[in-house]
Design a protein with these regions (language model features):
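PRPP-associated nucleotide enzymes
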Residues: 1-198
């Protein structure tokens, strides 16, 4: 459950695209050349597509895949903080079959907050890949919330630190109709046609 006193920062689609390309250049400039890129669904998939595309343009060919995390019966993100072991990771079979010890793995998400999603992915990969688990695993995100981090892991690459409630371009849940009208007017127009037709 989000604190109503936390400031909402609305991220525009064009802004997220630019941040993803900047993240890719930051990764490239560091000298890291991933063999695999894993985007964590939902927002990490979007960022991962742009990171992969930019790295490929810069001559870094990668294998790339999107995976998903979920919470075992937990309807609320807030409950996750007290029960991180309840995170499930879906869609890893391709990685189990293709990762090797010498590979370099980049995990991408849109926001690194508690760190539990990334930690769950790495823990699950280590358990199943065992000796084939890549020795070099790095994490990249446009947005990092250090005060919310409970995992003991910090992203290797991030562009911004914030404690704001980030509202990403695709998000509608948790927004009031007034916020949608103000910050997502095109979406508000589309939604109003549905409501009128209902």
């Amino acid at each position: 459950v989000q604190d109503v006193n936390v400031k909402k920062q609305f991220i525009e689609e064009e802004q997220l695209l630019e941040e993803a390309f900047k993240l890719a250049v930051t990764i490239f400039d560091s000298g890291f050349r991933p063999d695999f890129i894993v985007g964590i669904w939902r927002g990490g998939s979007t960022v991962g597509i742009y990171v992969q595309e930019c790295l490929q343009y810069l001559g870094v060919n990668t294998d790339h895949i999107s995976i998903r995390t979920s919470y075992r019966g937990q309807p609320s993100y807030g409950e996750l903080v007290d029960n991180p072991e309840r995170i499930r990771v879906h869609g890893l079979q391709y990685l189990f079959e293709n990762l090797n010890r010498g590979d370099k793995l980049l995990i991408v998400d849109d926001v690194f907050s508690s760190g539990y999603n990334v930690e769950a992915v790495i823990t699950r990969l280590k358990a199943k890949c065992r000796r084939n688990m890549p020795e070099e695993v790095r994490v990249g995100v446009p947005y990092y919330k250090p005060d919310k981090n409970l995992s003991g892991r910090k992203p290797d690459y991030f562009l911004h630190t914030t404690e704001d409630w980030l509202v990403l371009p695709y998000e509608l849940q948790g927004l009031t109709p007034e916020e949608i009208v103000q910050h997502k007017p095109d979406v508000a127009d589309i939604l109003s046609t549905i409501q009128q037709g209902a």
